């Protein structure tokens, strides 16, 4: 009989979702770099992405500039890595010691070099064009540590995937979802009179944002910008995540406790505003709200808008669409164009 894998005091049977970070990692970051959290908060181009993978016993605390990961502190099996992890392209910008023991002044230099390097502009902002990464940072900050007393929800996770014990279990667990998606894509091709891409995928990778409102509803939010064709297809991608999380919520009776623990940890370390502490719902409602966010939606053609609505009505009729009130504030409002 095959033994079940015990991780962090619980058993991984098929899937897992537990992104609360190792406390040892956070303690060491606070001791060695007590300035780092306030530094990120004071720079509008920066945001946090954090996580944990109980299967590999790995936790991470990353700093992003748009969609570019510029620094990661990580731990494995409770041991904190001495050297920060970063993509090779960013390592070229600074001396090796920076990635072992960064200082605020060095970080200023690092950011200036990133901003002036052409190949990194696509991750955040070109001279006149605000890319998807710009809005990801803007919205990510707005609904975490910049959350307001009047807000009904917070974002508690970003760029995430559901974990699986094995690749075989993942394929088996997802099969009914992929089959359902594939059937609807076939139906779309038969019923939609406009032009569609030759290839439309039934399954996808990372969720952009997960949110939680005061009613206990989970919000799945997919961000699109600068690619109208992908905006039109976003209900298909969001439907995949919706079906995945719906199934996970049915099967994982500890999901609420793990989400609550993540949120409380982030509040304790200042990654989510303290005003939300008394708003955490007592349980999940069972409702999942699928959403697309278009940072700036005024440039979408009528063809794209019509295609989006057709696909939405087929895949996720309840899907909501949002846009930002401004390019500097990040508050979400219902899109009038979608």
For the regions a language model picked out, list residue spans one by one:
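Charged, terminal alpha-helix-loop-beta segments
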Residues: 1-338
């Amino acid at each position: 009989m095959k033994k079940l894998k015990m991780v962090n005091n619980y058993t991984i049977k098929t899937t897992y979702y537990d992104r609360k970070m190792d406390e040892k990692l956070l303690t060491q970051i606070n001791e060695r770099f007590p300035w780092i959290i306030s530094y990120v908060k004071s720079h509008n181009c920066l945001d946090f992405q954090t996580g944990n993978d109980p299967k590999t016993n790995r936790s991470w605390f990353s700093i992003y500039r748009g969609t570019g990961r510029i620094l990661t502190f990580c731990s494995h099996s409770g041991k904190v890595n001495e050297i920060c992890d970063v993509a090779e392209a960013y390592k070229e910008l600074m001396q090796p010691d920076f990635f072992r023991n960064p200082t605020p002044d060095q970080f200023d230099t690092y950011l200036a070099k990133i901003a002036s390097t052409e190949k990194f502009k696509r991750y955040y902002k070109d001279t006149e064009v605000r890319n998807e990464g710009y809005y990801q940072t803007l919205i990510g900050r707005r609904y975490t540590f910049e959350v307001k007393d009047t807000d009904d929800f917070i974002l508690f996770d970003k760029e995430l995937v559901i974990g699986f014990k094995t690749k075989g279990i993942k394929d088996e667990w997802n099969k009914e979802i992929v089959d359902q998606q594939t059937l609807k894509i076939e139906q779309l091709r038969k019923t939609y009179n406009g032009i569609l891409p030759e290839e439309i995928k039934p399954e996808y990778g990372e969720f952009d944002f997960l949110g939680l409102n005061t009613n206990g509803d989970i919000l799945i939010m997919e961000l699109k910008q600068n690619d109208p064709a992908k905006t039109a297809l976003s209900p298909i991608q969001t439907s995949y995540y919706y079906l995945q999380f719906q199934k996970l919520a049915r099967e994982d009776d500890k999901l609420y406790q793990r989400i609550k623990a993540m949120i409380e940890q982030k509040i304790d370390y200042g990654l989510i505003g303290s005003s939300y502490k008394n708003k955490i719902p007592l349980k999940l409602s069972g409702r999942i709200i699928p959403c697309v966010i278009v940072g700036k939606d005024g440039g979408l053609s009528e063809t794209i808008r019509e295609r989006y609505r057709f696909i939405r009505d087929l895949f996720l009729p309840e899907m909501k669409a949002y846009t930002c009130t401004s390019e500097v504030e990040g508050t979400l409002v219902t899109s009038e164009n979608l």
